[in-house]
Amino acid sequence: MLERTLRVLEYNKVKEQLLEHTASSLGRDKVKHLVPSTDFEEIVEMQDTTDEAAKVIRLKGSAPLGGITDIRSNVKRAKIGSMLSPNELLDIANTMYGSRNMKRFIEDMVDNGVELPILETHVAQIVSLYDLEKKITNCIGDGGEVVDSASDKLRGIRTQIRTAESRIREKLENMTRSSNAQKMLSDSIVTIRNERYVIPVKQEYRGVYGGIVHDQSASGQTLFIEPQVIVELNNALQEARVKEKQEIERILLMLTEEVAVEADIVLSNVEVVANLDFIFAKAFYAKRIKATKPIVNNERYMDLRQARHPLIDPEVIVPNNIMLGKDFTTIVITGPNTGGKTVTLKTVGICVLMAQSGLHIPVMDESEICVFKNIFADIGDEQSIEQSLSTFSSHMVNIVDILEKADFESLVLFDELGAGTDPQEGAALAISILDEVCNRGARVVATTHYPELKAYGYNREQVINASVEFDVNTLSPTYKLLIGVPGRSNAFEISKRLGLSDRVIDQARNHISTDTNKIENMIAKLEESQKNAERDWNEAEALRKQSEKLHRELQRQIIEFNEERDERLLKAQKEGEEKVEAAKKEAEGIIQELRQLRKAQLANVKDHELIEAKSRLEGAAPELVKKQKVNVKNTAPKQQLRAGDEVKVLTFGQKGQLLEKVSDTEWSVQIGILKMKVKESNMEYINTPKQTEKKAVATVKGRDYHVSLELDLRGERFENAMARVEKYLDDAQLASYPRVSIIHGKGTGALRQGVQDYLKKHRGVKTFRYGDMGEGGLGVTVVELK
């Protein structure tokens, strides 16, 4: 990709924003080296990877990338035998922990059913080095100091140091508290000079304490003396400190050697977490600019829906639909300057660059983008003073370079093509240049203010005109792109709005040819038609989305209904079988007891009476099972079924009409607005004459369950009551009830208020009111359902 193209399309500014979302210098380094790819498979994988990270952010809010630093140079130094400092080792341990934590985070999400195949592959490359991590953290504290517990020897040495320091301080403090101390000392303190304990002695008393002078004050009046009585103690302390330093170095070398052994694994883990930091930075950036994953195709067309420029505030910019490559390969945007043509041009270019870099782009869902091997852009005034080039010459140098390199795998962006010279010659050059790049199969977007190019889009099959809408009422551009409508100057309308007289404007119109006037009028009508068509499309699209949403909701309710029904059937069957088993055991017990009584001659009971009693008890058991079980699947209907027959679908308890037979055992059935496949064993033929369909109250829970027309909540706790209201309204809607009543009582009014607050937000509620005098008054709410 040409560096000039990246510069004029402000690709580096996008990277600067992306840098703000990295968690470490590792991720920042990846962003700095980011360039668009031209490999189709790589781009698709990068987009899928960013999408998985975006899914993690949607579900979890963030990713645990804290504590990770760039430890690569430290690890490489360890490999060649250089001793690492405590802080360097601590950075390695923290990064090992961060990589292990990230691996566990992704694996936990996968274990919980979240599909993250690409991220799972990434974290699978992370090798846990828990033992090495713990060795380092057991030896080095959070502040970067080697702790006493790093070795028994170090603990012993530090005990000696603390003991020696305590003895020295005790002796010196006794000296400072003596009766003569106030006279001989400048201050009653114990301090340190040259790593040895000293006291501040006045110059004239230096011989009283003996020992060694280590320092003096700026005035020379105070000497910092190590008294003779503690010289040996200070010497012992220094020896212990030397031993401490040697032991610390031994521990650091030992840890460094262990890092060196695992260096290749550590470096591999670092590369993985660097990529993860980079991936999640792209996902966070997508969230920031409200971007989505585009569909990447290899067929050289793009369909950007509601595209926005990522560097412009999304609350300010006007999104546009931009299509290129299917019905036309070139878009020529005409119209006056300051209308937003250049922004549109840059939006196309930066969206392509971002997509080919694995970044999501600021467009609506289902947008498509293709892969270009080269992107050329001639945008802005980049004339060179040193080369003494004019604006026109500067553009032409760039255009010559583009014409030498552009091919069918190129996207070419021209801003104000042919500008900077005589309008007639400039327009002619613009047409020839466009013809040249179009003939090479390149995809082209060009802006121009030359009116001669308006006809260009009508005379070439693969070229279409476009313009940026201008509001003559506000005298400002709306920045709305109108594809298929060439731009017009609007000079007469603007002049009239600003107060120029009709007489002057009419005279001006007379100076323009009739054909030009006709073209301007035609363009105005095209603009109006475009607006109307777009408005109609938006309304139709809104209805389509609403219908899809309703369809999904109905499917969800049916699935929930089936699951709940099956659960109840299983529960009822289990309870029935338990009751049967209990009855059998009780019967056996009774019979056994009767036999024992007879043997004891305490009762006159015959065998045939015992057998008869047992048979009655056993006969009751199948009946109980029969009552508990509900046969969902009946035998196939005996009636020969044909398309158009009315049947009852047993699993739903709903009527439907047969559409067509899809297999030997299955039919396509229309049930209300739903169409589904149903097995013949799951339906009953209804032998009724065809008549005008009437809406009936449906039994939605099977043959033994009916939805009541009222729900009584009196005595319920608030949370339980709300849950019952939610389920009851869903059941009532499935049963097609037009109206139901909810009894909440009068009481304190809290339950009544809670019910009515919930009804206000329920999507299936049309209206609601208090009950009339005969309906329960303020203790009842009557609900009208949609």
Swiss-Prot record:
Keywords: ATP-binding, DNA-binding, Endonuclease, Hydrolase, Nuclease, Nucleotide-binding, RNA-binding, rRNA-binding. One of its GO terms (biological process) is rescue of stalled ribosome. This is Endonuclease MutS2. The keyword DNA-binding applies. PROSITE patterns: DNA_MISMATCH_REPAIR_2, SMR. InterPro entries: DNA_mismatch_repair_MutS_C, DNA_mismatch_repair_MutS_core, DNA_mismatch_repair_MutS_sf, MSSS, MutS, MutS2, P-loop_NTPase, Smr_dom. Endonuclease that is involved in the suppression of homologous recombination and thus may have a key role in the control of bacterial genetic diversity. Belongs to the DNA mismatch repair MutS family. MutS2 subfamily. Its EC number is 3.1.-.-, 3.6.4.-. ATP binds at G335, P336, N337, T338, G339, G340, K341, T342. Residues 711-786 form the Smr domain. Homodimer. Binds to stalled ribosomes, contacting rRNA. SMART domains: MUTSac, MUTSd, SMR. GO terms for molecular function: ATP binding; ATP hydrolysis activity; ATP-dependent DNA damage sensor activity; endonuclease activity; mismatched DNA binding; ribosomal large subunit binding; rRNA binding.
